[in-house]
C-alpha cells in the first residue's frame, strides 16, 4: 500500500472508531479518545464522564469494545485505557452531546445555545463558539452562532489548543448539527505576551551585591553609597 493511501486509511479508521465509541458510550458521557500506536500495539485512551459505565461489571463492556476494535475496525492489538473527565464543562464533546440532547427534549435553540456558552465560560474557558445548524424554526435551514471570549480559526493553534466537539440532534423537521469549540483555561496562546517593568541602574547594581564586607559596621553602612559606586569599584572588590 502506498504511503498516501495508508494515511487516508488510518484517518478513515480513526473516524469510524470515534463514531462507534460515541454511539456505544453515550450513557457514559463520552468525551473523546486518543489513538496512539506503540511497539506493543495500539493505545486507545477513552475520556468519559462516568468511567464505571465504560468498564462495565467485571470489565465486560471494555472487553467487548476491545474485541470490536480488533475484529470490526482492524485496530492492531488494542489496549483500552479509561480516564475520567475532571471538568465536563470544559470538554467540547460532552457539551456538544448535552446541547444536542437538550434540543431533542424541546429546548428552544437560542436558550440551549446561550446556556451552553455561559456554562463553558463560567468554568474558566478563554473562549468558546457554539454553532447550531439545520431546520431550527421552519422548513428552511439556517445557522446560529454563539461566541464569547477568544477563539482561534486558523493556524497551528487550531489543532493544538482548540478542543472541538460535534453531535447531532434528531427532530421531526430533520437533523440539527451542533458544534462546540473552546480554548481551555491555561492555554499558552502564541500571540500572548507580557510587558515587564524597566530595570533601573540602582536595581541592577543591587543584584550584583552578594555579600557585605566585614570591615563595614552594619549600623553605619550606607547601601545607597555602595550601590551608586562606579563599576570599577565593584571590580576591585
Swiss-Prot record:
Residues 17-86 form the KH type-2 domain. It comes from the Archaea. SMART domains: KH. InterPro entries: KH_dom, KH_dom-like_a/b, KH_dom_type_2, KH_sf_prok-type, Ribosomal_S3_C_sf, Ribosomal_uS3_arc, Ribosomal_uS3_C, Ribosomal_uS3_euk/arc. The keyword rRNA-binding applies. Coiled coil: none annotated. Pfam families: KH_2, Ribosomal_S3_C. Keywords: Ribonucleoprotein, Ribosomal protein, RNA-binding, rRNA-binding. Belongs to the universal ribosomal protein uS3 family. Binds the lower part of the 30S subunit head. NCBIfam families: PRK04191.1, uS3_euk_arch. This is Small ribosomal subunit protein uS3. It comes from Methanospirillum hungatei JF-1 (strain ATCC 27890 / DSM 864 / NBRC 100397 / JF-1). The gene is rps3.
Amino acid at each position: 500500500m502506498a504511503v498516501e493511501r495508508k494515511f487516508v486509511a488510518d484517518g478513515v479508521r480513526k473516524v469510524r472508531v470515534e463514531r462507534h465509541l460515541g454511539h456505544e458510550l453515550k450513557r457514559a458521557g463520552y468525551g473523546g479518545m486518543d489513538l496512539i500506536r506503540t511497539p506493543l500495539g495500539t493505545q486507545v485512551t477513552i475520556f468519559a464522564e462516568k468511567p464505571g459505565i465504560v468498564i462495565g461489571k467485571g470489565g465486560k463492556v471494555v472487553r467487548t469494545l476491545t474485541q470490536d476494535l480488533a475484529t470490526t475496525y482492524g485496530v492492531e492489538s488494542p489496549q483500552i485505557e479509561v480516564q475520567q473527565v475532571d471538568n465536563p464543562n470544559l470538554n467540547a464533546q460532552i457539551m456538544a452531546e448535552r446541547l444536542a440532547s437538550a434540543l431533542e427534549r424541546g429546548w428552544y435553540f437560542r436558550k440551549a445555545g446561550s446556556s451552553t456558552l455561559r456554562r463553558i465560560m463560567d468554568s474558566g474557558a478563554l473562549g468558546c463558539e457554539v454553532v447550531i445548524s439545520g431546520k431550527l424554526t421552519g422548513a428552511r435551514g439556517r445557522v446560529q452562532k454563539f461566541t464569547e471570549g477568544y477563539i482561534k480559526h486558523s493556524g497551528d493553534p487550531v489543532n493544538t489548543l482548540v478542543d472541538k466537539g460535534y453531535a447531532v440532534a434528531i427532530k421531526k423537521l430533520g437533523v440539527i448539527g451542533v458544534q462546540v469549540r473552546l480554548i481551555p483555561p491555561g492555554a499558552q496562546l502564541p500571540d500572548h505576551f507580557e510587558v515587564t517593568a524597566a530595570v533601573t541602574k540602582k536595581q541592577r547594581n543591587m543584584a550584583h551585591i552578594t555579600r557585605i564586607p566585614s570591615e563595614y559596621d552594619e549600623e553605619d553602612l550606607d547601601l545607597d553609597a555602595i550601590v551608586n559606586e562606579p563599576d570599577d569599584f565593584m571590580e576591585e572588590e
